[in-house]
Amino acid sequence: MEEFTLSSKSEGKYHEKGSIFSALAIPVSKVAKVKINLHQLKEQFPDASHICYGYRIKERGRLDEFATDAGEPKGSSGLPILNVLKRNQIVDAVIIVISYFGSAN
């Protein structure tokens, strides 16, 4: 099965019922780089409602997959993010969604 990687960082934003969702797709080659990116984003967006993410990283011949809902209802955020990477056969990438809840909260 063919695998794909990201050539560069991508960003997108979605607004719904007063809430804002900002997504980042970032190429990463090590889990440590995911943690660095998350630390930077948590400092940059300290008032975010949630920072959910999923990653797939092929390191030393082993595929490492992880997802977290970061306080959202179980299975509602992290797993769907991870599934985007899986369905598209993307490795060495993390997708991070930063959410701010408005009137929907």
Residue ranges and their predicted role:
Residues 78-86:
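Short, charged beta->alpha transition segments
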Residues 91-101:
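Glycine- and acidic-rich phosphate- and metal-coordinating loops
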Residues 1-76:
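C-terminal regulatory domains involved in ligand/effector binding and gene-expression control
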Residues 42, 85-90:
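Signal for well-folded cores of large energy- and translation-related assemblies
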Residues 104-105:
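Well-ordered alpha/beta subsegment
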